Amino acid sequence: MSNHEKMSTTDLMENLREELTCFICLDYFSSPVTTECGHSFCLMCLLKSWEEHNTPLSCPECWRTLGAPHFQANERLGRLANIGRQLRSQVLQSEDEQSICGRMPGPSWVFSDDEQSVINVSPPSQGTNKACFSSEAEEQHKEKLQDIINILRKKKKEVQAILNHEKERVMLCKEETKTCKQVVVSEYMKMHQFLKEEEQLQLQLLEREEKANMKKLRENEIQLTQQIRRLGKMIGRIESTCQNLTLESFEEVKGAMDRYESLLFQSPETTITELSLCHITGMREMLRKFSTDITLDPATANAYLLLSEDLKSVRYGGTRQQLPDNPERFDQSATVLGAQIFTCGRHYWEVEVGKKTEWEVGICKDSVNRKGNLPKPPGDLFSLIGLKIGDDYSLWVSSPLKGQHVREPVHKVGVFLDYDSGHIAFYNATDESLIYSFPPTPFHEALRPIFSPCLPNEGTNTDPLIICHI
Protein backbone atom coordinates (compact mmCIF):
# COMPACT_ATOMS: atom_id res chain seq x y z
CA MET A 1 0.00 0.00 0.00
CA SER A 2 1.42 3.41 -0.98
CA ASN A 3 1.86 6.37 1.37
CA HIS A 4 -0.93 8.15 -0.52
CA GLU A 5 -3.28 5.22 0.06
CA LYS A 6 -2.32 5.15 3.76
CA MET A 7 -3.11 8.83 4.14
CA SER A 8 -6.43 8.37 2.35
CA THR A 9 -7.36 5.56 4.72
CA THR A 10 -6.42 7.72 7.70
CA ASP A 11 -8.46 10.63 6.38
CA LEU A 12 -11.45 8.39 5.79
CA MET A 13 -11.20 6.99 9.29
CA GLU A 14 -10.97 10.49 10.74
CA ASN A 15 -14.02 11.66 8.78
CA LEU A 16 -15.96 8.59 9.91
CA ARG A 17 -14.93 9.21 13.51
CA GLU A 18 -16.15 12.83 13.37
CA GLU A 19 -19.55 11.72 12.08
CA LEU A 20 -19.87 9.15 14.87
CA THR A 21 -18.69 11.44 17.69
CA CYS A 22 -20.89 13.00 20.39
CA PHE A 23 -20.83 16.83 20.37
CA ILE A 24 -20.60 16.93 24.18
CA CYS A 25 -18.00 14.30 25.13
CA LEU A 26 -16.20 14.28 21.75
CA ASP A 27 -16.03 10.45 21.87
CA TYR A 28 -17.83 7.73 19.92
CA PHE A 29 -21.58 7.64 20.60
CA SER A 30 -22.71 5.52 23.52
CA SER A 31 -26.47 4.79 23.65
CA PRO A 32 -27.14 7.67 21.26
CA VAL A 33 -30.44 9.57 21.22
CA THR A 34 -31.73 12.14 18.73
CA THR A 35 -33.57 15.34 19.79
CA GLU A 36 -36.50 16.87 17.91
CA CYS A 37 -34.13 19.30 16.16
CA GLY A 38 -32.26 16.37 14.54
CA HIS A 39 -28.99 16.42 16.52
CA SER A 40 -27.68 13.29 18.28
CA PHE A 41 -25.84 12.86 21.60
CA CYS A 42 -24.93 10.17 24.09
CA LEU A 43 -27.89 9.63 26.38
CA MET A 44 -25.91 10.26 29.57
CA CYS A 45 -24.13 13.28 28.05
CA LEU A 46 -27.44 14.91 27.14
CA LEU A 47 -29.03 14.29 30.53
CA LYS A 48 -25.93 15.53 32.34
CA SER A 49 -25.85 18.67 30.18
CA TRP A 50 -29.47 19.48 31.02
CA GLU A 51 -28.83 18.78 34.70
CA GLU A 52 -25.76 21.05 34.90
CA HIS A 53 -27.40 24.03 33.20
CA ASN A 54 -30.45 25.34 34.97
CA THR A 55 -31.94 26.76 31.80
CA PRO A 56 -34.93 26.02 29.59
CA LEU A 57 -34.33 22.74 27.78
CA SER A 58 -32.33 23.38 24.64
CA CYS A 59 -30.17 21.52 22.13
CA PRO A 60 -26.50 21.67 23.26
CA GLU A 61 -25.40 22.01 19.63
CA CYS A 62 -27.82 24.49 18.01
CA TRP A 63 -29.30 25.94 21.27
CA ARG A 64 -32.82 25.58 19.94
CA THR A 65 -35.31 25.65 22.81
CA LEU A 66 -37.07 22.31 23.19
CA GLY A 67 -40.67 22.14 24.30
CA ALA A 68 -40.13 19.04 26.46
CA PRO A 69 -37.36 16.55 27.28
CA HIS A 70 -38.36 14.49 24.27
CA PHE A 71 -35.84 12.41 22.31
CA GLN A 72 -35.68 9.07 20.50
CA ALA A 73 -33.15 6.27 20.85
CA ASN A 74 -31.02 5.93 17.71
CA GLU A 75 -29.96 2.28 17.76
CA ARG A 76 -28.63 2.28 14.20
CA LEU A 77 -26.32 5.19 15.02
CA GLY A 78 -25.13 3.26 18.09
CA ARG A 79 -24.29 0.21 15.99
CA LEU A 80 -22.45 2.38 13.48
CA ALA A 81 -20.46 3.96 16.31
CA ASN A 82 -19.41 0.52 17.61
CA ILE A 83 -18.37 -0.55 14.11
CA GLY A 84 -16.42 2.69 13.67
CA ARG A 85 -14.67 2.21 17.00
CA GLN A 86 -13.68 -1.38 16.16
CA LEU A 87 -12.63 -0.50 12.64
CA ARG A 88 -10.45 2.36 13.83
CA SER A 89 -8.84 0.08 16.43
CA GLN A 90 -8.05 -2.54 13.79
CA VAL A 91 -6.61 0.01 11.39
CA LEU A 92 -4.39 1.47 14.09
CA GLN A 93 -3.29 -2.02 15.16
CA SER A 94 -2.49 -2.91 11.55
CA GLU A 95 -0.38 0.21 11.18
CA ASP A 96 1.46 -0.61 14.42
CA GLU A 97 2.21 -4.12 13.19
CA GLN A 98 3.57 -2.76 9.95
CA SER A 99 6.00 -0.67 11.97
CA ILE A 100 7.48 -3.76 13.71
CA CYS A 101 10.88 -4.95 12.63
CA GLY A 102 10.91 -7.15 9.51
CA ARG A 103 7.30 -6.42 8.55
CA MET A 104 7.41 -2.88 7.34
CA PRO A 105 9.44 -2.49 4.14
CA GLY A 106 11.84 0.35 3.86
CA PRO A 107 14.33 1.86 6.23
CA SER A 108 14.03 1.98 10.01
CA TRP A 109 14.11 5.22 11.93
CA VAL A 110 15.07 6.29 15.45
CA PHE A 111 14.99 9.63 17.21
CA SER A 112 18.13 11.70 17.14
CA ASP A 113 19.73 12.90 20.35
CA ASP A 114 18.02 16.26 20.16
CA GLU A 115 14.64 14.47 19.80
CA GLN A 116 13.71 16.87 17.06
CA SER A 117 14.33 14.50 14.11
CA VAL A 118 14.68 10.81 13.18
CA ILE A 119 17.56 9.12 11.38
CA ASN A 120 17.87 6.07 9.13
CA VAL A 121 19.81 3.25 10.82
CA SER A 122 19.47 0.55 8.13
CA PRO A 123 22.71 -0.55 6.41
CA PRO A 124 22.54 0.35 2.75
CA SER A 125 23.44 -3.14 1.63
CA GLN A 126 20.86 -4.96 3.67
CA GLY A 127 17.90 -6.56 1.94
CA THR A 128 14.79 -7.34 3.93
CA ASN A 129 16.58 -7.50 7.29
CA LYS A 130 16.19 -4.00 8.70
CA ALA A 131 17.16 -2.45 12.00
CA CYS A 132 14.31 -1.90 14.44
CA PHE A 133 13.41 0.99 16.65
CA SER A 134 15.46 0.94 19.79
CA SER A 135 13.46 0.62 22.99
CA GLU A 136 14.72 4.07 24.01
CA ALA A 137 13.46 5.66 20.78
CA GLU A 138 10.11 3.89 21.19
CA GLU A 139 9.74 5.28 24.70
CA GLN A 140 10.61 8.77 23.50
CA HIS A 141 8.04 8.39 20.75
CA LYS A 142 5.34 7.32 23.20
CA GLU A 143 6.22 10.13 25.59
CA LYS A 144 5.86 12.71 22.86
CA LEU A 145 2.51 11.26 21.79
CA GLN A 146 1.36 11.25 25.40
CA ASP A 147 2.38 14.89 25.74
CA ILE A 148 0.32 15.72 22.66
CA ILE A 149 -2.64 13.80 24.09
CA ASN A 150 -2.35 15.70 27.38
CA ILE A 151 -2.23 19.03 25.54
CA LEU A 152 -5.26 18.09 23.45
CA ARG A 153 -7.20 16.97 26.53
CA LYS A 154 -6.35 20.22 28.26
CA LYS A 155 -7.47 22.13 25.19
CA LYS A 156 -10.67 20.09 25.08
CA LYS A 157 -11.40 21.02 28.71
CA GLU A 158 -10.79 24.69 27.93
CA VAL A 159 -13.14 24.58 24.95
CA GLN A 160 -15.75 22.69 26.98
CA ALA A 161 -15.49 25.30 29.75
CA ILE A 162 -16.00 28.09 27.22
CA LEU A 163 -18.95 26.19 25.72
CA ASN A 164 -20.51 25.80 29.17
CA HIS A 165 -19.94 29.50 29.82
CA GLU A 166 -21.59 30.41 26.52
CA LYS A 167 -24.60 28.26 27.38
CA GLU A 168 -24.88 30.08 30.69
CA ARG A 169 -24.66 33.37 28.81
CA VAL A 170 -27.61 32.28 26.67
CA MET A 171 -29.77 32.15 29.78
CA LEU A 172 -28.25 35.36 31.10
CA CYS A 173 -28.92 37.11 27.79
CA LYS A 174 -32.53 35.95 27.88
CA GLU A 175 -32.91 37.18 31.45
CA GLU A 176 -31.33 40.56 30.63
CA THR A 177 -33.59 40.96 27.59
CA LYS A 178 -36.62 40.03 29.69
CA THR A 179 -35.63 42.61 32.31
CA CYS A 180 -35.12 45.31 29.67
CA LYS A 181 -38.52 44.54 28.17
CA GLN A 182 -40.11 44.90 31.60
CA VAL A 183 -38.35 48.24 32.10
CA VAL A 184 -39.52 49.47 28.68
CA VAL A 185 -43.11 48.44 29.38
CA SER A 186 -42.98 50.04 32.82
CA GLU A 187 -41.51 53.32 31.56
CA TYR A 188 -43.98 53.57 28.70
CA MET A 189 -46.83 52.87 31.11
CA LYS A 190 -45.62 55.84 33.16
CA MET A 191 -45.37 57.93 30.01
CA HIS A 192 -48.86 56.88 28.90
CA GLN A 193 -50.20 57.84 32.31
CA PHE A 194 -48.37 61.17 32.20
CA LEU A 195 -49.68 61.91 28.70
CA LYS A 196 -53.18 60.92 29.81
CA GLU A 197 -52.97 63.40 32.66
CA GLU A 198 -51.63 66.07 30.29
CA GLU A 199 -54.52 65.34 27.94
CA GLN A 200 -57.02 65.82 30.75
CA LEU A 201 -55.39 69.12 31.76
CA GLN A 202 -55.57 70.39 28.19
CA LEU A 203 -59.22 69.37 27.89
CA GLN A 204 -60.04 71.08 31.19
CA LEU A 205 -58.27 74.25 30.01
CA LEU A 206 -60.26 74.25 26.77
CA GLU A 207 -63.50 73.70 28.69
CA ARG A 208 -62.74 76.69 30.95
CA GLU A 209 -61.93 78.85 27.94
CA GLU A 210 -65.11 77.68 26.23
CA LYS A 211 -67.16 78.72 29.28
CA ALA A 212 -65.42 82.10 29.37
CA ASN A 213 -66.05 82.65 25.66
CA MET A 214 -69.69 81.60 25.97
CA LYS A 215 -70.14 83.98 28.90
CA LYS A 216 -68.72 86.88 26.86
CA LEU A 217 -70.95 85.99 23.91
CA ARG A 218 -74.09 85.82 26.09
CA GLU A 219 -73.29 89.13 27.81
CA ASN A 220 -72.73 90.83 24.47
CA GLU A 221 -75.94 89.27 23.15
CA ILE A 222 -77.88 90.77 26.08
CA GLN A 223 -76.31 94.20 25.56
CA LEU A 224 -77.09 94.17 21.84
CA THR A 225 -80.68 93.05 22.51
CA GLN A 226 -81.18 95.87 25.03
CA GLN A 227 -79.69 98.38 22.60
CA ILE A 228 -82.05 97.18 19.86
CA ARG A 229 -85.02 97.50 22.24
CA ARG A 230 -84.10 101.07 23.25
CA LEU A 231 -83.55 102.05 19.64
CA GLY A 232 -86.94 100.57 18.76
CA LYS A 233 -88.65 102.62 21.50
CA MET A 234 -86.94 105.76 20.32
CA ILE A 235 -87.97 105.12 16.72
CA GLY A 236 -91.60 104.49 17.75
CA ARG A 237 -91.80 107.66 19.85
CA ILE A 238 -90.32 109.82 17.10
CA GLU A 239 -92.66 108.30 14.48
CA SER A 240 -95.67 109.01 16.76
CA THR A 241 -94.53 112.58 17.31
CA CYS A 242 -94.12 113.12 13.57
CA GLN A 243 -97.77 112.26 13.01
CA ASN A 244 -99.00 114.84 15.56
CA LEU A 245 -96.35 117.51 15.36
CA THR A 246 -96.96 120.47 17.73
CA LEU A 247 -94.72 122.91 19.53
CA GLU A 248 -95.09 120.92 22.72
CA SER A 249 -94.40 117.61 20.99
CA PHE A 250 -91.35 119.12 19.27
CA GLU A 251 -89.97 120.13 22.64
CA GLU A 252 -90.70 116.61 23.87
CA VAL A 253 -88.80 115.09 20.96
CA LYS A 254 -85.90 117.43 21.57
CA GLY A 255 -85.79 116.28 25.19
CA ALA A 256 -85.98 112.65 24.13
CA MET A 257 -83.09 113.21 21.70
CA ASP A 258 -81.02 114.60 24.53
CA ARG A 259 -81.85 111.58 26.67
CA TYR A 260 -81.03 109.06 23.93
CA GLU A 261 -77.98 110.87 22.62
CA SER A 262 -75.68 108.42 24.36
CA LEU A 263 -77.61 105.57 22.77
CA LEU A 264 -77.04 107.01 19.32
CA PHE A 265 -73.30 107.12 19.81
CA GLN A 266 -73.03 103.51 21.02
CA SER A 267 -71.30 101.33 18.40
CA PRO A 268 -72.21 97.64 18.38
CA GLU A 269 -69.18 95.38 18.69
CA THR A 270 -68.59 91.69 18.09
CA THR A 271 -67.09 89.59 20.87
CA ILE A 272 -63.49 88.45 20.50
CA THR A 273 -63.13 84.85 21.61
CA GLU A 274 -59.79 83.18 22.29
CA LEU A 275 -58.61 79.59 22.57
CA SER A 276 -55.18 78.51 23.75
CA LEU A 277 -53.06 76.59 21.29
CA CYS A 278 -53.06 72.91 22.23
CA HIS A 279 -49.75 72.20 23.99
CA ILE A 280 -48.51 68.65 23.35
CA THR A 281 -45.75 67.39 25.65
CA GLY A 282 -42.83 65.82 23.79
CA MET A 283 -44.29 66.79 20.41
CA ARG A 284 -41.09 68.20 18.95
CA GLU A 285 -38.97 65.25 20.06
CA MET A 286 -41.39 62.83 18.38
CA LEU A 287 -41.58 64.83 15.16
CA ARG A 288 -37.79 65.28 14.95
CA LYS A 289 -37.57 61.59 14.03
CA PHE A 290 -39.18 62.48 10.70
CA SER A 291 -37.12 65.62 10.03
CA THR A 292 -36.44 66.17 6.33
CA ASP A 293 -33.82 68.47 4.85
CA ILE A 294 -35.77 70.99 2.76
CA THR A 295 -34.27 73.37 0.20
CA LEU A 296 -35.88 75.91 -2.14
CA ASP A 297 -36.31 75.32 -5.87
CA PRO A 298 -35.03 78.41 -7.76
CA ALA A 299 -36.85 77.36 -10.94
CA THR A 300 -40.21 77.95 -9.20
CA ALA A 301 -39.41 81.26 -7.44
CA ASN A 302 -41.28 84.44 -8.38
CA ALA A 303 -38.97 86.94 -10.09
CA TYR A 304 -39.28 89.38 -7.14
CA LEU A 305 -38.05 86.83 -4.60
CA LEU A 306 -34.42 86.64 -3.45
CA LEU A 307 -33.12 83.21 -2.40
CA SER A 308 -30.02 82.63 -0.26
CA GLU A 309 -27.03 80.76 -1.68
CA ASP A 310 -27.76 77.70 0.46
CA LEU A 311 -31.41 77.80 -0.72
CA LYS A 312 -32.59 77.90 2.91
CA SER A 313 -34.19 81.38 3.07
CA VAL A 314 -36.34 83.65 0.88
CA ARG A 315 -37.39 87.30 1.06
CA TYR A 316 -39.17 89.80 -1.16
CA GLY A 317 -36.57 91.84 -3.07
CA GLY A 318 -38.67 94.72 -4.41
CA THR A 319 -37.04 94.63 -7.86
CA ARG A 320 -38.03 92.23 -10.60
CA GLN A 321 -35.15 90.03 -11.71
CA GLN A 322 -34.53 89.05 -15.30
CA LEU A 323 -35.48 85.38 -15.08
CA PRO A 324 -36.97 83.05 -17.71
CA ASP A 325 -40.74 82.70 -17.54
CA ASN A 326 -40.60 78.91 -17.45
CA PRO A 327 -43.78 76.89 -16.75
CA GLU A 328 -42.60 76.02 -13.23
CA ARG A 329 -42.22 79.65 -12.08
CA PHE A 330 -44.89 81.62 -10.18
CA ASP A 331 -45.51 84.80 -12.18
CA GLN A 332 -47.97 86.71 -9.94
CA SER A 333 -47.82 85.17 -6.47
CA ALA A 334 -44.77 85.89 -4.26
CA THR A 335 -44.22 82.16 -3.87
CA VAL A 336 -41.50 79.52 -4.18
CA LEU A 337 -41.71 75.73 -3.83
CA GLY A 338 -39.40 73.35 -2.03
CA ALA A 339 -37.15 71.21 -4.18
CA GLN A 340 -38.25 67.99 -2.46
CA ILE A 341 -41.15 65.98 -3.91
CA PHE A 342 -43.09 63.60 -1.65
CA THR A 343 -45.03 60.54 -2.76
CA CYS A 344 -44.85 58.50 0.46
CA GLY A 345 -43.61 58.50 4.06
CA ARG A 346 -43.57 60.96 6.96
CA HIS A 347 -41.80 64.30 6.77
CA TYR A 348 -41.31 67.22 9.16
CA TRP A 349 -39.58 70.59 8.79
CA GLU A 350 -39.58 73.94 10.59
CA VAL A 351 -39.69 77.49 9.23
CA GLU A 352 -38.53 80.59 11.12
CA VAL A 353 -41.04 83.41 10.45
CA GLY A 354 -39.55 85.74 13.07
CA LYS A 355 -41.31 89.10 13.41
CA LYS A 356 -42.92 89.11 9.98
CA THR A 357 -46.39 90.65 9.83
CA GLU A 358 -47.56 88.40 6.99
CA TRP A 359 -46.35 85.03 5.71
CA GLU A 360 -47.54 81.71 4.32
CA VAL A 361 -46.05 78.21 4.56
CA GLY A 362 -47.48 74.80 3.81
CA ILE A 363 -47.82 71.98 1.31
CA CYS A 364 -49.28 71.91 -2.19
CA LYS A 365 -49.70 69.54 -5.09
CA ASP A 366 -46.79 69.42 -7.50
CA SER A 367 -49.30 70.25 -10.25
CA VAL A 368 -50.51 73.46 -8.54
CA ASN A 369 -51.17 76.33 -10.95
CA ARG A 370 -48.15 78.68 -11.07
CA LYS A 371 -49.65 81.36 -13.33
CA GLY A 372 -52.00 84.13 -12.25
CA ASN A 373 -53.09 84.90 -8.72
CA LEU A 374 -56.40 83.08 -8.55
CA PRO A 375 -57.41 81.20 -5.37
CA LYS A 376 -56.24 77.60 -5.36
CA PRO A 377 -58.94 74.90 -5.57
CA PRO A 378 -59.59 72.93 -2.36
CA GLY A 379 -57.20 70.01 -2.14
CA ASP A 380 -54.45 71.74 -4.14
CA LEU A 381 -53.11 73.78 -1.22
CA PHE A 382 -52.76 73.16 2.52
CA SER A 383 -51.19 76.26 4.02
CA LEU A 384 -50.93 78.31 7.21
CA ILE A 385 -51.06 82.12 6.95
CA GLY A 386 -49.90 84.49 9.68
CA LEU A 387 -51.33 88.03 9.71
CA LYS A 388 -50.63 90.90 12.12
CA ILE A 389 -52.70 94.10 11.92
CA GLY A 390 -51.85 96.57 14.67
CA ASP A 391 -51.83 94.61 17.90
CA ASP A 392 -54.18 91.95 16.56
CA TYR A 393 -52.58 88.68 15.46
CA SER A 394 -54.42 85.88 13.69
CA LEU A 395 -53.68 82.61 11.94
CA TRP A 396 -55.55 81.38 8.88
CA VAL A 397 -55.55 77.98 7.21
CA SER A 398 -56.29 77.36 3.56
CA SER A 399 -58.13 75.80 1.93
CA PRO A 400 -60.98 76.30 2.75
CA LEU A 401 -60.05 79.53 4.51
CA LYS A 402 -60.49 79.46 8.30
CA GLY A 403 -59.24 82.01 10.84
CA GLN A 404 -58.26 81.91 14.48
CA HIS A 405 -57.27 84.78 16.76
CA VAL A 406 -54.20 84.08 18.93
CA ARG A 407 -52.76 85.98 21.87
CA GLU A 408 -49.10 85.84 20.83
CA PRO A 409 -47.38 85.76 17.43
CA VAL A 410 -45.91 82.49 16.22
CA HIS A 411 -42.17 82.76 15.50
CA LYS A 412 -41.37 79.24 14.30
CA VAL A 413 -43.77 76.95 12.44
CA GLY A 414 -43.46 73.16 12.21
CA VAL A 415 -44.98 71.43 9.19
CA PHE A 416 -45.78 67.69 9.34
CA LEU A 417 -46.84 65.46 6.46
CA ASP A 418 -47.84 61.80 6.69
CA TYR A 419 -48.46 61.04 3.05
CA ASP A 420 -49.65 57.46 3.51
CA SER A 421 -52.32 58.35 6.10
CA GLY A 422 -53.30 61.62 4.38
CA HIS A 423 -52.40 63.77 7.39
CA ILE A 424 -51.09 67.37 7.40
CA ALA A 425 -50.62 69.46 10.55
CA PHE A 426 -49.02 72.74 11.64
CA TYR A 427 -47.29 73.26 14.98
CA ASN A 428 -45.90 76.12 17.01
CA ALA A 429 -42.37 74.76 17.26
CA THR A 430 -41.45 77.25 20.01
CA ASP A 431 -43.93 76.14 22.67
CA GLU A 432 -44.69 72.68 21.22
CA SER A 433 -48.37 73.30 20.56
CA LEU A 434 -50.68 72.18 17.78
CA ILE A 435 -51.95 75.04 15.60
CA TYR A 436 -54.15 73.14 13.18
CA SER A 437 -54.59 69.61 11.84
CA PHE A 438 -56.39 69.05 8.55
CA PRO A 439 -58.95 66.24 8.34
CA PRO A 440 -57.46 63.09 6.77
CA THR A 441 -57.27 63.49 3.01
CA PRO A 442 -56.16 60.73 0.61
CA PHE A 443 -53.34 61.92 -1.64
CA HIS A 444 -53.11 60.68 -5.22
CA GLU A 445 -50.22 62.73 -6.57
CA ALA A 446 -46.90 64.21 -5.54
CA LEU A 447 -46.76 66.97 -2.89
CA ARG A 448 -44.20 69.74 -2.31
CA PRO A 449 -43.42 72.33 0.39
CA ILE A 450 -44.60 75.87 -0.43
CA PHE A 451 -43.32 79.21 0.96
CA SER A 452 -44.38 82.85 0.59
CA PRO A 453 -42.74 85.79 2.43
CA CYS A 454 -45.64 87.94 1.11
CA LEU A 455 -45.38 91.63 0.15
CA PRO A 456 -43.26 94.05 2.24
CA ASN A 457 -46.27 96.15 3.46
CA GLU A 458 -44.46 99.51 3.30
CA GLY A 459 -41.32 98.13 4.91
CA THR A 460 -42.94 96.37 7.88
CA ASN A 461 -42.62 92.86 6.40
CA THR A 462 -39.14 92.64 4.88
CA ASP A 463 -37.70 89.82 7.03
CA PRO A 464 -37.01 86.51 5.26
CA LEU A 465 -38.58 83.10 5.78
CA ILE A 466 -35.83 80.74 6.95
CA ILE A 467 -35.90 76.95 6.74
CA CYS A 468 -34.42 75.74 10.03
CA HIS A 469 -31.79 73.07 10.62
CA ILE A 470 -33.35 70.57 13.02
Curated annotation (Swiss-Prot):
Family annotation (Gene3D superfamilies): 2.60.120.920, Zinc/RING finger domain, C3HC4 (zinc finger)
RING-type zinc fingers: which residues? Answer: 22-63
Q: Which gene encodes it?
A: Triml1
Q: Which pathway?
A: Protein modification; protein ubiquitination
Function as written in the Swiss-Prot or TrEMBL entry: Probable E3 ubiquitin-protein ligase which plays an important role in blastocyst development. Involved in progression of blastocyst stage and subsequent embryo development.
List UniProt keywords, sorted A-Z: Coiled coil, Developmental protein, Metal-binding, Transferase, Ubl conjugation pathway, Zinc, Zinc-finger
SS bond list: none
Question: Assembly state and interactors?
Answer: Interacts with USP5.
Entry's InterPro entries?
A: B30.2/SPRY (IPR001870), B30.2/SPRY_sf (IPR043136), Butyrophylin_SPRY (IPR003879), ConA-like_dom_sf (IPR013320), PRY (IPR006574), SPRY_dom (IPR003877), TRIM/RBCC (IPR050143), Znf_RING (IPR001841)
Q: What is this protein called?
A: Probable E3 ubiquitin-protein ligase TRIML1
Q: CDD domains annotated for this entry?
A: SPRY_PRY_C-I_1 (cd13733)
Q: GO:BP terms for this protein?
A: protein ubiquitination
Q: Which residues form a coiled coil?
A: 135-170, 196-235
**Tissue spec. comment:** Testis.
